[in-house]
Amino acid sequence: MLLGRGMSEDSLYDYLHPSLDKLSSPYEIDGMKEAVERIKQAIANKEKVLIYGDYDCDGICAISTLMLYLRDKLDVFYFIPDRNKDGYGISVDTLERILAYHSPKLVITVDTGITAVEEVEFLKSKGIDTIVTDHHEPQERIPDCIVVDPKVERKGFFDLCGAGVALKLVEALGGREEARKYLDIVSIATIADVVPLKNDNRIIAYYGLKQITKSPRKGVKMLLNQESVSAQDVMFRLAPRMNAAGRLNSAMKVVGLFLETDYFLLRTLTDELARDNAQRQELCEKAVESAKSQLAGINFNDVGIIVLKSNEWEAGILGIACARLVEEFKRPTVLFARTDDGELRGSARSIPQVNIFELLCSLSEYFTGFGGHAQAAGISMNEDKFDDFVKAANKSLLDMRDKLDFTHEISCEMELPFDMDFLSFAKELELLEPTGYQNPRPTFLVKAQGLRFDRIGFSQHVKYVAKNIELIGFSKFAPCLAAKTGRVDFEISLGINAFQNRESAQGIIQTLQFEDVDIDDDEAIRMNLHQLDCEGSANLTQTTVNRVEGWLKEPFGTAIVCFSHEEYDNVCKASEKIKSLPVLIATPRCLNPENCVVLCPADCFDFSFFNRVIVAGHPLCEGYLAKLQKESNEIYSLGDCSPKPISVSKDVLRKVYKEIVNVSRRTPKMASPHKMYAMVCSGYKTSESTFMLALKIFDQVGTVRINDKGFVEVSAKSVNLDDSIAYRNVSKA
């Protein structure tokens, strides 16, 4: 597997067994010798020193590393700009405010400064020296001062994060043993800043995580509150909380996470960070939903890059929102917020095939400022340049369309046989940790036939348990995996689940692809029952197979909807082009509107990003067609799509209700809907779809309720079944 990633056999041992002895020399970075000499001079003269850093996790960790090393050696203080008041990086206005209260003789920048040409000249005019330590890409001019940025000359290993550069500076000043004290802090930045986890970065992350697990700093321990810490814990639990304050206002307080030792001050700080993160999540969710509403109805065949703006967005959360949209739509994304002075300030994120920094360099005429690296960037621009930038950026990427792939594909390291010893292999995979950017947690292709997943309790998640592995499908996969299917290709990540001193292999489903469809009529009805919650009338325009095939000449924008296996077979017989389309059962893989056939779409299926929906089958009621017509940009029928209602009698409903009452008295808590059906209907012949329909009707009239814990609540009150919209939509046998 590792050889398949391009590694040589000679490098495998060092990769699998990281060693601090293999760290590169800090003096491989140009400017390091001069920086050390100037800082030693400052220490000897007891000069006042300002450390100026960025407001993200990387900047915070870089500041903390230098502060901890220097604070008992000279008079040192730090400053982090307020994202909303000061903007990104160093500015003359911000420096003037600082100098009104402080008189440093030396300014050291961390994780910023490589573009601060004018700002360094301003400091020189005040008699203040500057050392720029950064890891971002340099532009045509670099500041006229001591510069320590591995990307300037790109010698040796140059993909350090900002805190990694700060660690190299500490090592050059105090030696490797001194630098080891800060590996835990720098490992957090290395993982959070999405730099390649190879060479020095892998060593830093490996030993830093061990340090956090063995002897965590008090603030980190309070934030995570767990014994063992992984790269995923840092990326998804620790870093977002550290970043939240800087995304909303000021990150100055976050440095206290590493500098402070008082329990009560740290408890106050960690509580504040948790609140900031909750607010950040809320703002981010609103921005993503707002961006999605702007994208609904556009033709994605003409979109090479997503570029949007809004007055309502907070600039600080746009990077996360961009990443979410990249994941959903498989395209580079740039989002802008409008500032009070009318300028647009934005963030960019990219797909692996597109170096966003190089793209922005080619379009720099449109910006008042920008910076970043291959997969992420920050941008400022005047609003009157926005439309021209959108056209130019989109043209650049559409011109590269032959080299890019905006579609969703299963991309795995290798295929694993379903009968293998997954547990032993999962244990071997632990040697790959820590995983992250350019050292990804591997995913594997597993092919299986006819699996029946059970819901995990009454949650939105499902699982399939075999002797050698447990497959878990989280909420978005639940509707499609709840049905018995034909052959499915699963992309899974592999891990170990430990419970009651027993270890087992666990495969988390990342995505899936149906290679054939094997849903029987009863399962199809059960999956379509949500349609009975809809009312209204519809008037669909008829279309033809030839016209549909014309639309399919473009890769995006057309969804063909069927409601049963038979209907899918019929439409495939009518068109080889339709037969070649990917099949989605119940739920989308993402929001990217790639041409597809949707079989038994779930209630949550969002058709708003498709240009057109083709109905090629019979729904359970006309109300569902009305819902589709309301939610679709264009909707057509291919052949007869009149409703085919299902039927249920009051006698059947009475029997099911009576059995539910009897069973709930014996067993008030149910394990899952499927097991509840087996218990209730074991004494007589009732299909699972009829049972689930009965549950839906009972829930709507208030006679039977099942909470998310599986507890059954039964009411004996007299009800009118016609109060149930589902009952009104079925035939009364």
Language-model segments: residues:
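Hydrophobic helix-and-loop "lid/oligomerization" segment in the mid-to-C-terminal part
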Residues: 1-106, 126-127, 174-391, 405, ...
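Acidic, two-metal ion nucleic-acid-processing modules in DNA metabolism proteins
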Residues: 65-66, 71, 202-240, 244-288, ...
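Short alpha-helices
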Residues: 65, 141-192, 199, 627-630, ...
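Short loop/helix-cap segments at secondary-structure boundaries that form the rim of catalytic
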Residues: 138-145, 571-574, 591-593, 605-609
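Hydrophobic, small-residue-rich alpha-helical packing segments that form membrane-like cores
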Residues: 65-165
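Acidic beta-strand-to-loop metal/phosphate-binding motif
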Residues: 50-52, 105-112, 610-618
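A short acidic, amphipathic alpha-helical/loop segment
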Residues: 118-123, 306, 321-324, 570-574, ...
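Conserved RecA-like helicase motor core of SF1/SF2 enzymes
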Residues: 593-595, 599-645
